[in-house]
Amino acid sequence: RSRGLGDVYKRQDYNDACSILAGKRHYYRAFKNTNRKWGVPIHVQMAVIYYESSFQNRAKTPMRYFLGIIPLGRESSAFGYAQALDGTWTDYKKATGRSIARRSSIRDSADFMGWYMTKTRKLTGVSLSDAKNQYLAYHEGQVGYLKGSYKRKQWLINKAKNVGNRSSKYKRQLSSCIRT
């Protein structure tokens, strides 16, 4: 039987796309709006956010320490659902005119990913449905992707494969609870 988003789930299960959207209805609205505006499939957006922030709106990169005790600051400026860097987020706000967009907003983060992935498609030819290669370009930047910088990073290639697999899994799951 088809499960609707209104079905009750006992707890938020981040391995189940329908559970995620049922527990956070505003996520579905954000992902759907991004899909309509930019063409990025909902399951691709969800898979990237899962690996970038585990759906935590204020996610930050880990702290770095000198001698294991003296804090040196964060690994990068990445923040929020999409783990967007300060400079890239500023570029997004300027390019889209969304000057008050916040990285801690699922709506703004999903829109950012749509904007970024659309740029990736234009610059690299990577399909918006190709979660694995979109993730590689998302992580390395479009120029880094074109140069193949990820090829020397087996851990990143493995992670991108996981993003692709999770995207496929989410796509299958979503077919039972929403019309895509």
Stretch-by-stretch model annotation:
Residues 11-180:
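Catalytic glycan-binding domains that act on GlcNAc-containing polysaccharides
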Residues 2-9:
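Short, small-residue-biased leader/transition segments that mark boundaries at the very start
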